[in-house]
Structures are given as structure tokens and as C-alpha cells.
């Protein structure tokens, strides 16, 4: 058990594939983060927040949390809409479970110590050429402003540093989403600048603030 920002971090470590040189390694293309998929029974904990890989059985809780949080999520999450359904949840989860096992993206459920679903946090949009990825996160409205997202970002970052060959994790946030920007800052990410018209949300282009965490 290692100390992480004054909280405790607990996990079962997955194997690490070393970074590879050269341009035509097909196994690297299939596993762009350089992460081995032989041990996915990972649980990470910081204080009263736990991150674990998603399971398809999480679909009902995700759907409930999304509808509870529509007002807050819709402006900033392109996948969020009033007709979000259990089928949408299941389809997304099926894809993410496969992506996690293949080392293509790593989405985690944020849960309380008693197992209640709080939100999601993941390492995705992975580009192996420059060994970079993106961290995305959201928390259901009833759990906002309690440090849940900040703890989740810290855990996801440490997991990526210990279990993949990525050297840079970006957090891209719409300029108007000040709450998410505060999470990035509290998690220790560095604000690098504003990218014009970088995010398209519900068919509208938005300027975005770029934050980063590096190895």
C-alpha cells in the first residue's frame, strides 16, 4: 500500500509490456498502450473511492446515474442525451470491456467502498506514436464537489504510469466547464493553454483548455 496525496492507494499490479522501437510491430498496433491484458483483476482505492474495470453488469447503474445527472452532463458530454438508454449503456460497456482486454483503452468505474456507482474515469484516445493518452471523467450529480473526481484522476494517472508505457496524459476540457477544470488542477495537472475550436459538443465547436500529466 503506497501513499498517494495523503490517501492510500491499493491495487493488484498488471504486467507491463516494454516500449518497443520500430514502426511495423503488429503486436504493438494491437496493444497501443504497451499494456498486458493477462491480469485485469485490478482494484485501486484512495480514501473512500475505488476504481475498477467496468463489467457489462454495470449498465443499469450507469443508466440511472446518467439520467440523474442529465442537466449537468449534457452540456459537456457528447454521448449524453435525454433518450440515453440501458441499451446505450450495454453497448458502450461491451465495447469498453473488449478494448480494456486488448489494451486499446482503459475505462474504470468509480465506486464507493460499499459498491455504489459514482461515475467513470478512463485512459483513452491512446496514440502510441507519441506514447500519449487522454484522461476523461464524470461523476454523478449527487456525488459532485466531494473530491471523487480528483481522487479518480490521480488513481487513473498512477495506474497508467505503472502499467503502460505512456509518458503523457492529456485532459481536454471545454472553456466553459470550470468545474472539470478545477478537478484537473486539484489532481496536479498542468494547464498548458487554450486550443481554439478543439471540441465539438452536440454539433457546436468549443474552445478547450489543455491540461497534462506527464511521467
Where do the protein language model's features map onto the residues?
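Residue-level detector of secondary-structure transition/capping positions
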Residues: 67-70, 81, 97
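Acyl-donor (CoA/ACP) binding surface of acyl/acetyltransferases
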Residues: 1-61, 65-72, 107-215
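Short, polar/charged, Gly/Pro-enriched helix-capping and turn/loop motifs at alpha-helix termini
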Residues: 76, 80, 103-107, 167
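Generic alpha-helical scaffold signal
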Residues: 56, 67, 83-90, 104
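Conserved GNAT-fold acetyl-CoA-binding loop/helix
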Residues: 74-94
Amino acid at each position: 500500500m503506497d501513499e498517494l496525496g495523503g490517501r492510500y492507494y491499493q491495487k493488484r499490479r498488471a504486467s507491463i509490456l516494454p516500449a518497443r522501437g520500430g514502426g511495423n510491430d503488429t503486436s504493438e498496433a494491437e496493444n497501443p498502450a504497451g499494456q498486458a491484458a493477462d491480469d485485469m483483476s485490478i482494484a485501486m482505492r484512495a480514501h473512500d473511492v475505488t476504481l475498477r474495470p467496468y463489467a457489462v453488469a454495470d449498465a443499469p447503474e450507469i443508466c440511472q446515474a446518467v439520467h440523474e445527472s442529465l442537466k449537468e452532463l449534457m452540456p459537456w458530454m457528447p454521448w449524453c442525451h435525454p433518450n440515453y438508454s440501458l441499451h446505450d449503456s450495454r453497448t458502450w460497456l461491451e465495447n469498453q470491456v473488449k478494448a480494456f482486454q486488448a489494451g486499446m483503452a482503459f475505462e474504470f468505474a468509480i465506486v464507493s467502498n460499499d459498491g455504489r456507482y459514482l461515475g467513470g474515469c478512463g485512459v483513452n484516445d491512446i496514440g502510441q506514436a507519441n506514447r500519449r493518452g487522454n484522461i476523461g471523467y464524470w461523476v454523478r450529480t449527487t456525488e459532485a464537489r466531494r473530491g471523487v473526481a480528483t481522487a479518480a484522476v490521480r488513481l487513473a494517472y498512477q495506474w497508467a504510469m505503472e502499467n503502460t508505457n505512456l509518458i503523457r496524459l492529456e485532459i481536454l476540457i471545454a472553456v466553459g466547464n470550470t468545474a472539470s477544470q478545477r478537478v484537473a488542477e486539484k489532481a496536479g495537472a498542468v494547464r498548458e493553454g487554450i486550443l481554439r475550436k478543439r471540441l465539438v459538443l452536440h454539433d457546436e465547436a468549443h474552445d478547450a483548455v489543455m491540461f497534462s500529466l506527464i511521467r
